[in-house]
């Protein structure tokens, strides 16, 4: 018979290759696969490899016109998930030829574009990706990175402080600018547009940019420190987004902001390129991430979105807090914080890292801890996130009983006290509360903040636990 045999054949015959070893240039993926009852794991794993690379549901004549073995994804290892019935980690290797250079959009379209609706699987979650050096080098990555940001801001040896301006919707541009000024004047490094502040009827973007720039320069003149406000450039079209970034550059502000998941990777990469060319820092908000990453058995883990952002480009990204109101289990959070900041990260399953990742010369991204945190959390945050981080207190600044500026003062005093205590060799984890109490003796603003928030805790079990 001729080589071509029509009909449906099992995926595992072609796409399950337990003997093969992955190449250094392959993109590797770890999927948590939950097959439908009766579907063997080898078939499910091979189905994922096939549907996310060269396969389709039946043998096609045109397969003969190419070398499938050269271009197909292959499932090279399967292991059961400990403690879960009928769940497996399937490791898939994709040849580099399958992907367009420098395109996160294409990488995701290939790897997660189609296969998640596949009928033979009850659920599917992409847990981790290993991006090979050969592919990493096709991306610009973050516009500036951690060291360049510190040099631009002239701030060293401590975490940076931020604050999201609230109420997030409804303020006029002038009142918004006033809140920005008060926070920066009180001692914060950054203030932030909320992710859904774009250009609404009650406050158009240009007015907001102007009033925020004015607030920034006034606070800079009075404090002698460089200040920033994350001007949200996210818009309905790429052209409009770039127009807003251009205006921010003309105002001479240091940083703009983008919602990278709702805005999309193509828009984000364009903005990152613009930011590097024009000396703007880029703050990234992860709005919509929980739609993708919150379910334990389906979707995509945040560490994958994290790696994608480092390729696409951003200087800051929100990372959960470990201690506030939004999720983040400590070891897992620290695992992906390292993936953001370090050049080389070893495989470590206890922190959810499935592959060793080498970022070579791609700049790092600063993790932003934000959501339900206040002065009492400061020692823990300083201890967990270290110096290369932004600690963002929205309500924890603006909720101060005396107003915004005293709220900012309280946070800055608490931070400086924690950094000093750490540098003196004290144990922040154990002595944290004592350090804050001591500092509040000579800062009435901090004392008032300690009064208001002494009892608040958001105690729920984290959804994202290690198996």
Curated annotation (Swiss-Prot):
Additional remark text:
The basic functional RuBisCO is composed of a large chain homodimer in a 'head-to-tail' conformation. In form I RuBisCO this homodimer is arranged in a barrel-like tetramer with the small subunits forming a tetrameric 'cap' on each end of the 'barrel'.
Q: Which residues are the active-site ones?
A: 166, 285
- Source species, please? Scutellaria bolanderi (Sierra skullcap)
Function, as annotated, reads: RuBisCO catalyzes two reactions: the carboxylation of D-ribulose 1,5-bisphosphate, the primary event in carbon dioxide fixation, as well as the oxidative fragmentation of the pentose substrate in the photorespiration process. Both reactions occur simultaneously and in competition at the same active site.
Please name the gene that encodes this protein: rbcL
Modified positions (N6,N6,N6-trimethyllysine) are 5
Query: What does this protein's record comment on cofactor binding?
Result: Binds 1 Mg(2+) ion per subunit.
Q: How does it assemble?
A: Heterohexadecamer of 8 large chains and 8 small chains; disulfide-linked. The disulfide link is formed within the large subunit homodimers.
The name this protein carries in UniProt is: Ribulose bisphosphate carboxylase large chain
Q: Name one GO cellular component term.
A: chloroplast
* One of the protein's GO biological processes: photorespiration
